[in-house]
Amino acid sequence: MTAISLGMPAVPTKLADRRVSRQIQVGTVAVGGDAPVSVQSMTTTRTSDIGATLQQIAELTASGCQIVRVACPTQDDADALATIARKSQIPVIADIHFQPKYVFAAIDAGCAAVRVNPGNIKQFDDKVKEIAKAASETRTPIRIGVNAGSLDARLLKKYGKATPEALVESALWEASLFEEHGFGDIKISVKHNDPVVMVNAYRQLAAQSDYPLHLGVTEAGPAFQGTIKSAVAFGALLSEGIGDTIRVSLSAPPAEEVKVGLQILEALNLKQRRLEIVSCPSCGRAQVDVYKLADQVSAGLEGMEVPLRVAVMGCVVNGPGEAREADLGVASGNGKGQIFVKGEVIKTVPESKIVETLIEEALKIAEQMEKDGIASGEPQVSIGA
């Protein structure tokens, strides 16, 4: 009998190879080349309030942020940059709009990099030679940050709106001005609030240059909406090997941006997975309150710093299989739970003891992992089927 081909494409077993880009150094963090994708965020404080800004940077650092950006709209903010850059635990990027003088102030202050927006800095093109000279002397990278909302009027007239082509043309034009003056420590972003436009812009940019790319969906929205937009856009690009740093823009506390960014990287296996709680979404087969159980286990293991997969399952259909695949798991039913460790049932406990037992066993496994030198990391919790 002749075999019938269903015409199904082969399922890739890994992401596309990383795009080859030049590497720059943002303070202590390598960006581009073969460096890992890093997570950025931005402070929401007045930069001139040095204490509040440093406090927020400390909180971001604790959440796993690797690079932080601070706004610099006033002279008071510019005056604060030196102290903030010196005392910050992670590299500080100064975010400059409208006034070229603040670019020089940020470089003089010792910021790890400077973001410039070519769409709104007055006489920016005329200042590129001076900026390139100052940045070269201090080895300060420049991020050319193009945003759909502040695109140059010339390009809006040419394209009619902020198309992917308009964003890319703006970025590469400005990069070429720096290159004319011998400066190549450049990172580029081409942000749009529409993930489809944003993805297409980055694909075009990746095909036309070797600059490291900072990914972002601008004005992504409230936490839930912004998370979805960013996950869709970043997932598409990172799976194609495009992207060297990411920032999840949310109308939420900055630490939430970092949490989402880290989880996106972990979901794509671009970062060591941390604590991962896999729990079923619940259905009519569930014989326990899965939501409550998962929340209690998550709360009990908060802060655990080893890559541990814990399965919390509510019935006998998928429960045993998922529990066996995890480092630790429970398959619940009939008022009790079977506790699995590394695929083996070690005990059966009453429903009232499930959470307590899982936490005890998780701590035992974590202790052994730490003794064995297993890499640590920030917690991650994901709820899935």
From Swiss-Prot:
Its EC number is 1.17.7.3. [4Fe-4S] cluster binds at C280, C283, C315, E322. Pfam families: GcpE (PF04551). Signal peptide: none annotated. InterPro entries: Dihydropteroate_synth-like_sf, IspG_bac, IspG_bac-typ, NO2/SO3_Rdtase_4Fe4S_sf. One of its GO terms (biological process) is terpenoid biosynthetic process. Binds 1 [4Fe-4S] cluster. Belongs to the IspG family. Converts 2C-methyl-D-erythritol 2,4-cyclodiphosphate (ME-2,4cPP) into 1-hydroxy-2-methyl-2-(E)-butenyl 4-diphosphate. NCBIfam families: ispG_gcpE, PRK00366.1. This is 4-hydroxy-3-methylbut-2-en-1-yl diphosphate synthase (flavodoxin). It comes from Streptomyces griseus subsp. griseus (strain JCM 4626 / CBS 651.72 / NBRC 13350 / KCC S-0626 / ISP 5235). The gene is ispG.
